[in-house]
Amino acid sequence: AAGKLSIGVTPWVALTFLPPAVQRFRQRMPEVQLEFFEGLLAVVQPRLRDGSLDFSIGRPPPASPVSEFHNTPLFSTHSAVVARRDHPKAGCRSLLELEDAEWVLNWDPASRESISDNLFRKRGMRVPHTIHLAHSLAVVLGLLAHTDMLSIFPWPLVEVTLAKENLWALPLRETVDETMVSI
């Protein structure tokens, strides 16, 4: 029986884990039509709510005692601070050296406080005033290539974009962030 499956995916999952997963799915269920929506929580949650998405793969919603969606953790991965190769801070070895940096993050606004807590406050750092949120990985890549902004990418995305996009993972001593991926 043919059917349709609508899936929301975060940009970095779309570039790393989605292609082989889709190939395996298509081998087992070739008659099912797939529809993909790229987006963070702000994009996928309304579609999950109205039923136009069957599920999403990405960062889980912030912890809440009353969650409207059931989510199952799939895996976690570490992240890295990235910049263009010739960035003035490309050689920095500590997050403290990045306290005055300008950031562009491909993260959902709902995650902003937990990001600030996990990345900056727990290390005794002040939260930078210039954390820009971008709802597009293409926007982040463009800004990283042509400005002095920094970003944080999960390692699987670092591995597929560094050479191609002329980016550099800063050799920091600290662990930057652990990203949980759930369905």
Kindly label every feature range from the protein language model.
Residues 2-63, 133:
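Central regulatory/effector-binding core of bacterial HTH transcription factors
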Residues 7, 47-49, 98, 142-148, ...:
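Hydrophobic residues within well-ordered alpha-helices
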Residues 21-28, 52, 113-127:
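Ligand-binding cleft/hinge of the Venus flytrap
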Residues 28, 39-101, 157, 174-177:
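Acidic, Gly/Pro-rich loop/turn segments at junctions of secondary structure
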Residues 33, 47, 51-52, 73, ...:
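Conserved functional loop/turn residues at catalytic and ligand-binding sites
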Residues 59, 89-93, 101-124:
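Secondary-structure junction motif
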Residues 83-84, 106-107, 129-130, 153-154:
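Thr-Gly-centered strand-to-loop micro-motif
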